[in-house]
Amino acid sequence: MKIDLLLIPVGARYPEMRAAARAAEDAGYDGVWTWDHLRDPDERAEAGVPEAWTTLTALAEATRRLTLGPLVLNTGLRHPGLLANMAATLQQVSGGRLLLGLGAGATRSMSYAREQEALNMEVSPDRVRAERVAETAQVLRRLWTGDESSFVGTQFRLDRPSGFLRPDPPPPIIVAGFGPRMAGIAGLHGDGFNTQAMHPNLAELARVAREAHAASGREPARFSVSVFAGLSERWLRAGTPERARLERVGVDRLILLTSPPYDLGGVRLR
């Protein structure tokens, strides 16, 4: 099982994120992630949130070995054509270390949705947001592989696209969610599924995702299941009940969240 860190960006400054990523690399962690949010969900005016993609691009130059990714990109914030080029470019900058996490964004009832509402950006219904994730993954693959055929979905359309940057290799697409609908989308259109480590239905969601992936006709061995949890000893140490549960489910990657000011001593525990 790979062990990664997620650097929560709320209230952080890039120099401390860079220092934490380098400490994680030195400590033997496998990857670093960050959130994709526009502001602090608690609306603290002084906090601020560094933009995810800019941060990841800078971290690609600041590290050598770590995989890098957003956990996860809100597909309501970027058109998939723009995202395809962003991801292809970061794949070049990082030397092929990108893991592209995609998510549906927040529901209207969640505090995270207020960042979009404050900018007069639409917060779509659940069905629309789920469709957007599925179609974003399809559009990305078409543009990355040079497929010039037209695409007509419910959320996006392509008119014989050509000439877009093609990453080599294309980054894996990791779809995050907390229910069977998103697990199914992850299996059908993604290369991996991500959810909470303590999700009560973790085994069932992993099964749904894997079965959907097998039904898509793609290689089952290439599909991954990852989870996230807070950085603590019970997740860092092998052999704990928490780690044993993940192993029974077949989790491939554990992503541990840490907040600023980042405890570099804690980061070095592994």
Positions of predicted regions on the chain:
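Active-site-adjacent structural elements that line small-molecule/cofactor binding pockets in enzymes
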Residues: 1-270
